């Protein structure tokens, strides 16, 4: 394979990842199959970078003319519109299942139900409120820091969530599941590029902030793995969405705490 063909393949994979995790349409010339979708997992972090960057741009463009809370809300709306609430939906389904089921089978069945339950509604409300409040505090501290935090959090949270595909068991047998093509374990190339995208984006932070966030994300990933294994024995597409949302919130929390003590 020539260098040009290799670059074309990588661009194809990024566009597949973008089309899967956002509402941004893929070019018509991009062909999608299960193998491509699995390999595209290497670029999930870069998709987060794109979503975070666009959300940050909306915030930066509006924060001089609008109250911080409104600018933050507009940035959050931008993120939801770009992704179609993909991860938020997974968060709600996960909390409905984990909160309402006794056995792993019950939890998986409840998570499959498209209706929103009380546990999912509470989780969505609390996460969105907490995300808004943390970002408002960051915006009042420094608008540049707040926008940078959006970029970092959207990227790193997706890296952590997608890394679960590499180590954990996919527990749905339903062939119609949208996440089924992702369920094959990632190769070393996929994992390396995925982690590299997360590490590189940390370079926008100060040394202590980057190190603190890295250590917290490593610990949080381990905690998420333990919980998912105990609850359902592995992961589903919904739990990956929940992991992304939780990691994003924790990113903002860490950056706010570190920023306040520097």
Swiss-Prot record:
GO CC annotation: plasma membrane
Family matches, as InterPro entries: CobS
One GO term (biological process): cobalamin biosynthetic process
GO molecular function: adenosylcobinamide-GDP ribazoletransferase activity; cobalamin 5'-phosphate synthase activity
Chain segments annotated as transmembrane: 43-63, 66-86, 120-140, 146-166, 191-211, 242-262
Keywords: Cell inner membrane, Cell membrane, Cobalamin biosynthesis, Magnesium, Membrane, Transferase, Transmembrane, Transmembrane helix
Primary residence: membrane
Pathway as given in its UniProt record: Cofactor biosynthesis; adenosylcobalamin biosynthesis; adenosylcobalamin from cob(II)yrinate a,c-diamide: step 7/7
EC number(s) from the headed UniProt entry: 2.7.8.26
Subcellular locations according to the entry: Cell inner membrane
Catalytic activity: alpha-ribazole + adenosylcob(III)inamide-GDP = adenosylcob(III)alamin + GMP + H(+); alpha-ribazole 5'-phosphate + adenosylcob(III)inamide-GDP = adenosylcob(III)alamin 5'-phosphate + GMP + H(+)
Cofactor: Mg(2+)
Membrane topology (UniProt): Multi-pass membrane protein
RNA-binding listed as a keyword: no
Purpose of the protein: Joins adenosylcobinamide-GDP and alpha-ribazole to generate adenosylcobalamin (Ado-cobalamin). Also synthesizes adenosylcobalamin 5'-phosphate from adenosylcobinamide-GDP and alpha-ribazole 5'-phosphate.
Similarity field: Belongs to the CobS family.
The protein, known as: Adenosylcobinamide-GDP ribazoletransferase
Natural source organism: Shewanella sp. (strain ANA-3)
Name of the coding gene: cobS
